[in-house]
Amino acid sequence: TSPTHVVLAFAKAMEELEEEGGIPARSRRYRENNRLLISEMKKLGYDTYVGSDVQGPIITTFLFPENAGYGFAEMYAYIKERGYAIYPGKVTEAETFRIGNIGEIYKEDIEKLAQIISDFQKEHKAR
């Protein structure tokens, strides 16, 4: 039996890719998402783990601030409750977290996530 659900999902994904303008347009959106995410996160005090010369547009790793006054679990829960997800870092020598830049993610999503993180920071500084 052929995996019809897989074939149908692939066909739909290819249709959506074509509607967006193909690989060049999708790649451009991912790169723009990445640049905007890094810019917004830097405004909030988060630095990237790797330099821009090696940063790819798929997922971005940020350093978790050493003296933030809150933990990753608190920040994760706050963001998750508001409909977004971030991921714990997998780097052993530094405290990090990751944010994906691909999929159904657009400028407005990046801006909303940045606002949620900003609100979280304000609430935790007010404690």
What are these model-derived regions, one by one?
Residues 4, 56, 80, 93-95:
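A generic structural signal for well-ordered coil/turn residues at beta-strand boundaries
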Residues 47-78:
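Conserved PLP-binding catalytic core of the aspartate aminotransferase-like
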Residues 20-29, 43-52, 88-91, 125-127:
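Flexible, glycine/charged-enriched surface loops at secondary-structure junctions
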Residues 1-39:
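Active-site C-terminal subdomain of aminotransferase-like
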Residues 95-127:
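PLP-dependent enzyme catalytic core of the Aspartate aminotransferase-like
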Residues 12, 16, 36-44, 74-84, ...:
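Generic non-transmembrane alpha-helical segments
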Residues 82-98:
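Conserved PLP cofactor-binding pocket of PLP-dependent enzymes
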Residues 2, 29, 67, 105, ...:
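Catalytic cores of large soluble enzymes that bind and process phosphate-bearing ligands
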